[in-house]
């Protein structure tokens, strides 16, 4: 008879403990009920990126002196720089410049160490394609200026996300 009483007491304690845990979870749920939603409706609403956002790289062909500093500081030796030495003026002439964004880690070293500032980071982050070979951008594609999110009238921009209260 004694073991049956202890089992009944354990059952009662477990029931009380379970009810307490459910109550704690329910209180957390209720505390989040009066907060604003954090999610945004992505294709129709977009956040304004910060000033130092590291998006797609913009390249200015005329400023580049083909020094290949960007290739040396890149952790994965990504930029492909093709140049030809002009013997009469003893300078390099840039022939081709390309970056494969399928491999790029967007670290920003190439932009930071470029002596002529011909590379810059843009706010463009929508680079997804169905074919990975389309992510290999040449100097013409890199020179294209991105359309700003603010200028697109079909998208509602959200300047700052509501702060999350902890």
UniProtKB/Swiss-Prot annotation:
It catalyses: a plastoquinone + NADH + (n+1) H(+)(in) = a plastoquinol + NAD(+) + n H(+)(out); a plastoquinone + NADPH + (n+1) H(+)(in) = a plastoquinol + NADP(+) + n H(+)(out). It comes from Venegasia carpesioides (Canyon sunflower). It is found in: Plastid, Chloroplast thylakoid membrane. Its cofactor is [4Fe-4S] cluster. Binds 2 [4Fe-4S] clusters per subunit. Keywords: 4Fe-4S, Chloroplast, Iron, Iron-sulfur, Membrane, Metal-binding, NAD, NADP, Plastid, Plastoquinone, Quinone, Repeat, Thylakoid, Translocase. Its main location: plastid. One of its GO terms (molecular function) is quinone binding. Pfam families: Fer4. It comes from the Eukaryota. NDH is composed of at least 16 different subunits, 5 of which are encoded in the nucleus. Belongs to the complex I 23 kDa subunit family. The keyword Flavoprotein does not apply. This is NAD(P)H-quinone oxidoreductase subunit I, chloroplastic. Its EC number is 7.1.1.-. PROSITE patterns: 4FE4S_FER_1, 4FE4S_FER_2. SUPFAM superfamilies: 4Fe-4S ferredoxins.
């Amino acid at each position: 008879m004694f073991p049956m009483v202890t089992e009944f007491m354990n059952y009662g304690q477990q029931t009380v403990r379970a009810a307490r845990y459910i109550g704690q979870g329910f209180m957390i749920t209720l505390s989040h009920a009066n907060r604003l939603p954090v999610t945004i409706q992505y294709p129709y609403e977009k956040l304004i990126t910060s000033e130092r956002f590291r998006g797609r790289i913009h390249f200015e062909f005329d400023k580049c002196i083909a020094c290949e500093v960007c290739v040396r500081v890149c952790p994965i030796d990504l930029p492909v720089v093709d140049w030809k030495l002009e013997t009469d003026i003893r300078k390099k002439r840039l022939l081709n410049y390309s970056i494969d964004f399928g491999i790029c880690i967007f670290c920003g070293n190439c932009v930071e160490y470029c002596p002529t500032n011909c590379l810059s980071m843009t706010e463009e982050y929508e680079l997804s394609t169905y074919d990975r070979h389309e992510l290999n951008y040449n100097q013409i594609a890199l020179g294209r200026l991105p359309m700003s999110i603010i200028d697109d009238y079909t998208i509602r921009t959200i300047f700052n996300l509501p702060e999350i209260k902890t």
